[in-house]
């Protein structure tokens, strides 16, 4: 089964349309399980991560883990106030993007639409704080104070209401592409690996809670105990006003990470494979931790030899995250190739 941008884009859309903020990944888990079930038995860890062995391999061969995080950023209701909802962030969110954003409140009685709002500057007092901060924002539910108090409660989860859209040049924009596009790349690689049946054992981990600490990756790595692992996440793509030395172009290929927490030999092996097989590659050196699940996986159990592949993404942690599916396809191709060429 060949790896195509069309299949990856379709998988990414399906995953992005399933809500799954950190710690509440159930709907996203179900969508991912549907995509992975044809390749092997899907198991759920106690922390809500997904594990699936897609190739048993030969006895004594290395065990490779392919990982991406399933959770997304979101919000949690902190207080119901006169029909409006006060809320806090789940994960890192740029508050400047939030005013007038449509959201969905996932309450006990069902899902309800809302709009993020605030007191208009021209109606606020002269001494009011007009800056865009989470504590200055509310969610307008449209309900009366009495009805809202019955429907909503502190602890309810909120996600962006937007769905992925296709831009020119087949690029995708929308919420949750961090890291559902990484999940789609891992699933595409898994399909290829399951069909080719290489010598090494290959397990897929789609982890929970990356945006709040990486607990799903750490426990998933401990459970699976691989020899090697490739974490797939997103990193800063180019955009208007962004320094080119701090970003990588969309469409330029997967970003290979270099960091003290990553295994140098394994990383260079992937670099060589990409160069020998004309897979576009960009380079992302980091002086310390990577800020991804690779850091937690590296120290799981007895330790795992890690590599990191990142897909360039614009407007990170917003409702309009933007990627080029071809970068995800090349990420998947490199992972599949790594299983065929050995370690």
Language-model features, listed with the residues they occupy:
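N-terminal hydrophobic/helix-forming segments and targeting peptides
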Residues: 1-343
């Amino acid at each position: 089964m060949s790896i195509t941008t069309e299949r990856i884009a379709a998988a990414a859309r399906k995953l992005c349309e399933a809500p799954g903020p950190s710690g509440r990944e159930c709907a996203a888990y179900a969508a991912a399980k549907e995509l992975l079930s044809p390749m092997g038995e899907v198991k759920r860890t106690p922390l809500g991560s997904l594990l699936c062995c897609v190739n048993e391999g030969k006895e004594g061969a290395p065990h490779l883990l392919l990982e991406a995080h399933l959770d997304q950023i979101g919000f949690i209701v902190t207080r119901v106030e006169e029909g409006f909802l006060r809320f806090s962030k789940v994960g890192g969110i740029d508050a400047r993007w939030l005013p007038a954003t449509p959201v969905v409140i996932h309450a006990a009685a069902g899902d309800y639409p809302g709009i993020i709002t605030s007191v208009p500057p021209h109606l606020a007092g002269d001494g009011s704080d007009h800056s865009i901060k989470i504590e200055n924002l509310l969610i307008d539910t449209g309900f009366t104070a009495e009805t809202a108090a019955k429907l909503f409660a502190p602890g309810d989860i909120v996600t962006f209401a937007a769905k992925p859209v296709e831009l020119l040049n087949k690029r995708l924009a929308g919420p949750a592409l961090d890291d559902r596009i990484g999940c789609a790349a891992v699933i595409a690689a898994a399909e290829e690996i399951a069909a080719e049946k290489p010598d090494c054992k290959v397990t897929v981990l789609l982890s929970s809670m990356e945006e709040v600490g990486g607990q799903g990756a750490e426990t998933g790595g401990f459970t699976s105990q691989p020899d090697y692992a490739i974490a797939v996440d997103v990193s800063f793509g180019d955009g208007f006003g962004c320094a080119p030395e701090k970003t990588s172009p969309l469409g330029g290929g997967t970003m290979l990470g270099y960091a003290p927490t990553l295994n140098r030999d394994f990383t260079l092996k992937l670099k060589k494979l990409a160069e020998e097989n004309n897979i576009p590659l960009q380079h992302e050196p980091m002086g310390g931790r990577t800020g991804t699940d690779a850091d937690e996986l590296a120290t799981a159990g007895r330790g795992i030899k890690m590599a990191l592949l990142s897909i360039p993404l614009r407007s990170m942690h917003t409702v309009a995250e933007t990627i080029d599916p071809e970068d995800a396809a090349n990420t998947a191709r490199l992972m599949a190739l790594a299983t065929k060429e050995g370690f």
